[in-house]
């Protein structure tokens, strides 16, 4: 009999979730599957923008499927023609921008089934990924 972790189980495992590239003008959205609970340790993604002049601001949003539970908007603007790595982790103390990498603190999160992790980017233009 196979035992897999569920929200009623004391078992758990470290798992990396890799989504497909959402493509131009699309945002990231991951949903916790049914009968699962995710304990989030870190979130890591890239945003590549084209030459369209605009300062974009990236937000990371955690919701319960309908209502926002946690949201952070990066204070550092993401300019045109730029490839920036965004990293949210429990080890970061404050927001920092270092060599096209943006680091942000992440609270301890335990998400039930149906909860979502998603991004929202202001002024996302054609060619931005």
List each language-model region with its residue ranges.
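Beta-strand-centric surfaces of beta-sandwich/beta-rich domains
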Residues: 2-129
């Amino acid at each position: 009999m196979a035992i897999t972790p569920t929200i009623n189980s004391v078992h758990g495992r470290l798992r990396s979730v890799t989504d497909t590239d959402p493509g131009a003008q699309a945002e990231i959205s991951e949903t916790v599957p049914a009968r699962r609970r995710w304990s989030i340790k870190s979130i890591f993604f890239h945003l590549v923008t084209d030459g369209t002049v605009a300062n974009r601001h990236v937000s990371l949003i955690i919701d319960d499927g309908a209502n926002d539970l946690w949201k952070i908007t990066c204070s550092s603007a993401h300019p045109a023609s730029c490839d920036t790595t965004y990293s949210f982790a429990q080890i970061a103390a404050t927001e920092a921008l270092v060599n096209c990498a943006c680091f942000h603190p992440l609270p301890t999160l335990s998400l039930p089934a149906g909860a979502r992790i998603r991004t929202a980017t202001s002024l996302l233009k054609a060619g931005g990924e």
